[in-house]
């Protein structure tokens, strides 16, 4: 009888081994960084200069990141909130500059991130790509000497309300389970052909949370 009980217990343990192995493997899969699709939310500050002062604008955004082993494709949208002024050339205005009231901006950002090395749960990274920055509302001040002058100024304001620019990012994320917290800083040249041109470079500092939603590539089982 003792032998039968021992054999029965052994068979029961053997039957449980595959389930235990699967349970141990599942968390590892959930924490996998490679070939994953992260969705994220973030907040921070956008720092730039207008014609008279430096601006620190609160910024919120969403992002999507598709990873491989050491690289990732990164797409994000950010909204910055501010009220300030810019200027465009207008020979009919005093000082040949027409003041433009500016409100808020949005950035559409596409980059390639490199994750060169992992330090425990920390993953430092660097990114390079392009961003489209668009001012939400821009209205020239004052009156115009003629309809033609008004049309010219409005056309210049429209042309200077958006700008495509290179963007460079440095950051780090800390992985835990299927999530990751991160902090990053980006820099974009915005001096030329743009209403926000008080400084040669616009900076953005952000922090947020990424969630590993699903596999980016279907795994073979």
Q: Where do the language-model regions lie?
A:
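Short glycine/proline- and aromatic-enriched beta-strand/turn motifs that initiate or cap beta-hairpins
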Residues: 22-73, 210, 214-216, 221
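Residues that define the transmembrane beta-barrel architecture of outer-membrane proteins
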Residues: 35-37, 54-60, 69, 102-108, ...
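Membrane-embedded beta-strand positions of outer-membrane beta-barrel proteins
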Residues: 39-43, 73-77, 110-112, 124-128, ...
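Transmembrane beta-strands of outer-membrane beta-barrel pores
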Residues: 43-49, 68-70, 77-83, 130-136, ...
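Extracellular loop and loop/strand-boundary signature of outer-membrane beta-barrel proteins
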Residues: 46-50, 93-101, 152-158, 191-197
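Outer-membrane beta-barrel translocator domains and adjoining extracellular loop/strand segments
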Residues: 51-58, 85-92, 136-146, 183, ...
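Gram-negative (and chloroplast) outer-membrane scaffold detector with strong preference
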Residues: 63-146
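Predominantly the C-terminal beta-signal and adjacent terminal strand-loop region
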Residues: 82-86, 168, 173-221
């Amino acid at each position: 009888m003792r032998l039968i009980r021992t054999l029965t217990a052994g068979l029961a343990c053997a039957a449980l081994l595959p389930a235990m192995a699967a349970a141990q493997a599942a968390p590892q899969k959930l924490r996998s960084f490679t070939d994953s699709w992260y969705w994220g939310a973030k907040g921070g500050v956008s720092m730039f200069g207008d014609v008279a002062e430096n601006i620190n604008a609160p910024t919120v955004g969403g992002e999507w990141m598709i990873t491989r082993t050491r690289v990732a494709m990164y797409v994000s949208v950010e909204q910055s909130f501010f009220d300030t002024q810019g200027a465009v050339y207008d020979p009919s205005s005093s000082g040949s500059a027409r003041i433009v009231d500016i409100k808020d901006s949005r950035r559409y950002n596409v980059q390639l991130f490199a994750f060169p090395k992992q330090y425990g749960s920390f993953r430092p990274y660097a990114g390079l790509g392009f961003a489209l920055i668009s001012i939400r509302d821009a209205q020239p001040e004052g009156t115009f000497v003629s309809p033609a002058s008004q049309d010219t100024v409005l056309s210049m304001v429209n042309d200077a309300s958006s700008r495509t620019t290179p963007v460079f990012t440095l950051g780090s994320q800390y992985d835990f389970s299927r999530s990751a917290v991160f902090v990053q800083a980006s820099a974009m040249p915005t001096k030329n052909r743009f209403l926000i041109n008080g400084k040669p470079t616009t900076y953005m500092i952000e922090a947020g949370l990424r969630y590993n939603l699903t596999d980016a590539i279907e795994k073979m089982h």
